[in-house]
């Protein structure tokens, strides 16, 4: 049996990746609509061996459609997601708009798939922030074993997390380094991103943290356990795709590195590559196009009781966005739609 699926924002980085993943995972699609704003109307996108033309989101009727995967900004989501939901179409939203609404589930299927039942509240399910998604996949199985008290995370986030404009800016600035006549000043980012790192993602909050850092705190609590203390420093780095995170974890109970490694090896969505030798770890460039969240550099933290350090890498356009959304859709099909 197939289902009627709409991809909203099909011409963007995440929207195109959603189409790729729907095809790769052989999602049971009966009818597929690719939607975009009027300025992108008629743009062609690929779905498997098919070429589809985008339709106008503004005039699209969601009645009779099963699932809409939203890959647009919060403003467009605010306008169109309620329309789709009211028509009886489940919205899986990749923006930040609904993540902190207590009535809307925030789901990472490897972690809290049971929260899918909350779809009944508003017919909307939220996708987490890219940096949160990969981290909680690593944290949850360890939390189940030894109960996490506190997490300290520093992120190394690629420019694709800022959209196509971020990718273009890194590319243009990198070229201009070798051609000073064609200087490219910052537009998307606050400072030059080429050959640089920027400790600033999203807007600053009153306490000195950034919105990106606040998101990691709030979302980890909502997805995993509200009792976990989290502090984050989020940094933009000159990498096109793939986010990395250095994570320090303090547990209630002792958990040695060997047991942690074994637990993670058996955990869904996780790939452990952790050899104590040159190259025995995963870097962002190696995770591009992969579904897994890669874990390396697992080791005890000798400065605290019950502490561990690890390195976490994932494709932010996949697990951090498009893949997670499709996985949520799979849970909805398997647990809800197929039972009707």
Whereabouts are the PLM-identified features?
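Charged docking surfaces used in two-component/phosphorelay signaling
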Residues: 68, 159-340
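N-terminal Rossmann-like NAD(P) cofactor-binding subdomain of oxidoreductases
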Residues: 1-193, 229, 293-294, 298-304, ...
């Amino acid at each position: 049996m197939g289902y009627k699926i709409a991809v909203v924002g099909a011409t963007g980085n995440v929207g195109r990746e959603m189409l790729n993943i729907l095809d790769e995972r052989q999602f049971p699609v009966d009818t597929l609509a690719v939607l975009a704003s009027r300025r992108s109307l008629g743009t062609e996108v690929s779905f498997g061996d098919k070429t589809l033309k985008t339709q106008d989101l503004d005039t699209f009727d969601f009645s009779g459609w099963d699932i809409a995967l939203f890959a647009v900004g919060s403003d467009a989501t605010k306008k169109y997601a309620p329309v789709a939901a009211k028509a009886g179409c489940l919205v899986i939203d990749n923006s930040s708009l609904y993540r902190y609404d207590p009535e809307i589930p925030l789901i990472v299927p490897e972690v809290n798939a049971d929260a899918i039942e909350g779809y009944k509240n508003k017919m909307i399910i939220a996708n987490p922030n890219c940096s949160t998604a990969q981290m909680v996949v690593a944290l949850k199985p360890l939390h189940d074993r030894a109960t996490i008290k506190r997490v300290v995370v520093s992120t190394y986030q690629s420019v694709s997390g800022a959209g196509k404009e971020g990718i273009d800016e890194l590319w243009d600035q990198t070229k201009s380094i070798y051609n000073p006549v064609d200087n490219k000043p910052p537009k998307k980012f606050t400072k030059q991103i080429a050959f640089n790192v920027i400790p600033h993602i999203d807007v600053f909050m009153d306490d000195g943290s950034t919105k990106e850092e606040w998101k990691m705190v709030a979302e980890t609590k909502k997805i995993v356990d509200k009792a976990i203390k989290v502090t984050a420093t989020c940094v933009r780095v000159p990498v096109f795709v793939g986010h990395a995170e250095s994570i320090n974890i303090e547990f209630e109970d002792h958990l040695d590195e060997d047991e942690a490694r074994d637990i993670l090896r058996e955990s869904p969505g996780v790939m452990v590559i952790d050899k104590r030798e040159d190259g025995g770890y995963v870097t962002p460039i190696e995770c591009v196009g992969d579904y897994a969240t890669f874990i390396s550099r697992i080791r005890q933290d000798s400065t605290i009781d019950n502490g561990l350090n690890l390195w976490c890498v994932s494709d932010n356009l996949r697990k951090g966005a498009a893949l997670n959304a499709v996985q949520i859709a799979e849970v909805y099909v398997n647990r809800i739609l197929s039972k009707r």
